[in-house]
């Protein structure tokens, strides 16, 4: 769905309404004014992938979907946020990206240290490393590659 043809204020208003109704939530980009980090970006996620699928009008089985990575990322992040809320863990949640497109899918900040999560639908693609600009700049408590095989450790 391309939103660039719509008035940005109208899009913002609708996203704000959906957020107030607990249909979607937004993650802000994490930045501490390092020159190459995105400072203003936000990502929108659905609390329920079924609503996401309905909006996109796509109920194709996962094995046939071209957006399985985005679905997996949306699923894990929404479940992790629900888990943290349920457990009383009020870590600040972000994503991180540089102008060179280096990215960490999801970050939790708690007591000045960070836990970084990278989502991979394919369990064979877990040889992911923390981008060096992040590793060199911030205290990293843990880096986790989340797959369908291990996600329950972080959501239940």
Task: Set out the residue ranges of the language-model regions.
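Accessory nucleic acid-recognition modules appended to NTPase machines
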Residues: 1-111
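Hydrophobic/aromatic beta-strand patches that form the interior of the parallel beta-sheet core
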Residues: 45, 94, 115-117, 144-146
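A short pocket-lining beta-strand/turn micro-motif at the edge of beta-sheets
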Residues: 102-104, 112-115, 139-142
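Active-site ExK catalytic segment of metal-dependent nucleases
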Residues: 113-123
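Catalytic cores of nucleic-acid endonucleases
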Residues: 121-156
């Amino acid at each position: 769905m391309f939103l660039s043809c719509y008035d940005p204020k109208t899009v913002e208003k609708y996203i704000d309404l959906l957020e107030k109704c607990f249909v979607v939530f937004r993650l802000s980009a994490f930045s501490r004014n390092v020159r190459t980090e995105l400072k203003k970006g936000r990502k929108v996620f659905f609390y329920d992938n079924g609503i996401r699928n309905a909006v996109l009008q796509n109920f194709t089985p996962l094995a046939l979907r071209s957006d399985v990575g985005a679905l997996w990322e949306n699923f894990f992040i929404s479940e992790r946020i629900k888990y943290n809320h349920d457990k009383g863990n009020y870590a600040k949640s972000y994503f991180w990206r540089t102008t060179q497109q280096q990215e960490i899918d999801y970050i939790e900040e708690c007591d000045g240290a960070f836990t970084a999560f990278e989502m991979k639908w394919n369990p064979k693609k877990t040889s992911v490393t923390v981008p060096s600009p992040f590793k060199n700049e911030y205290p990293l408590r843990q880096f986790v590659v989340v797959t369908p095989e291990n996600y329950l450790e972080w959501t239940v």
